[in-house]
């Protein structure tokens, strides 16, 4: 049983800017796993932070918790134009992930936002909520991954056909996202290489999602594409950061070299992502039981 004091101690680590970013991330994922109103309250307090990376991750976790009590804070973040685009985007995506149709009006309103990543995110979230309404009771988390995705995977299993749908920029973004998650679920080298081709597509939002999905897939065939995208200084920081985190999750020696190369990147979100990714690399390469170890750090060993 987790005590109120323990949740408070983990929450204080999360919101303390003096703590190393890695410790704050581990605290965040611990709170996400614990869930409930106190965890939501602590996570919500972090949106004043100076790190866009941390704030975007706060929004991501609130969406993955799928608790309607997080809707008000996420709606505020989406509407707050002083927040960085990647933070607002993640808040919009999180509102779609929670799956409550009451936010449809708000998401439709921001589907024409002047910030293209925010507009596209809200369009996808509207697509997801409308899909849920048309397919009640149908599992959206089917497959080997537990994440709540911005679009349900396509039923198609053929990698060639899915690749074609993924890379066809004339198709609706929602349809291409469905192909993306289907490729991830199929898995294997061919699917990883098809996804990596998506890192060349036109939409920065799309490219960043490809980076995220390749991190979930953890296939080393994607490492060259991810490393090249991370190294491309003209690329959107939102995309580069996702590629860095994917390299941390894949955790092969070639990933380590790419991450170390950008640990002092002039772009804050890229620099911080490499820090967090190196911590993730360490975890993936270790025998540690879990990454979200906020409770273990509080409790003395038996």
From Swiss-Prot:
Assigned EC number: 1.14.99.29
EC class of the enzyme, as a word: oxidoreductase
Entry GO CC: cytosol
Catalytic function, reaction form: [eIF5A protein]-deoxyhypusine + AH2 + O2 = [eIF5A protein]-hypusine + A + H2O
Sorted UniProt keywords: Acetylation, Hypusine biosynthesis, Iron, Metal-binding, Monooxygenase, Oxidoreductase, Repeat
Residues given in the record as Fe cation 2 binding sites: 89-90, 208
Manner of cofactor binding, per the entry note: Binds 2 Fe(2+) ions per subunit.
Cofactors, names only: Fe(2+)
Record's keyword annotation contains Repeat: yes
Similarity comment text for this entry: Belongs to the deoxyhypusine hydroxylase family.
Protein name per the record: Deoxyhypusine hydroxylase
